[in-house]
Amino acid sequence: TVCTTIHSNSCNSTYRRMMTLAKRKYNMDDSVLMQIMVEAYPVVVFTKQLEDRSRKIMEIIEGEDYLDGKLLYRSLYKYEVVDNVTLEGGETHVVGHHRKMCSISDGLIKRLLDNGISHKELEEFTGKVVD
């Protein structure tokens, strides 16, 4: 498992940011480089500090492919800001919740199983029985 951190403005812009950083060292075609990165880092987690200074996971995506100059991905989870409430004393409190958008792909399920995750853990995460 490879984990890293990168400063970017959104989940899907993280791949473009990785490409920009990689191009400093490697002279490769953009589409080849993006395909390599999507395969190497299929899951991207985007965190952000909100107005009330709390940090939230704003989105989790699964990068699936990069074709014809476009990133193909599925949004797995999003944090939805419902309101910004001003408390006594003038402090702001962000009200929101996480929402599941999509399930991970069958390809990622297979990859996780091949790399050691148990059926039990995967079923707890996906909420469905895995073959």
Where are these regions (language model features)?
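Conserved P-loop NTPase nucleotide-binding/switch module
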Residues: 1-38
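Structural signal for conserved beta-strand scaffold positions within catalytic alpha/beta enzyme cores
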Residues: 3-4, 46, 62, 78
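Alpha-helix initiation and N-capping motif
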Residues: 11, 15, 54-57, 105-106
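Conserved, well-folded catalytic cores of nucleic-acid-processing
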Residues: 17, 21-25, 40-47, 63, ...
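Residue-level signal for secondary-structure boundary elements
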Residues: 26, 49, 120-124
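A general structural signal for short secondary-structure boundary/capping elements
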Residues: 29, 49-51, 89-95
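Phosphate-binding/switch region of NTP-binding enzymes
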Residues: 33-67
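NTP-binding/hydrolysis catalytic cores, primarily Walker-type P-loop NTPases
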Residues: 57-131
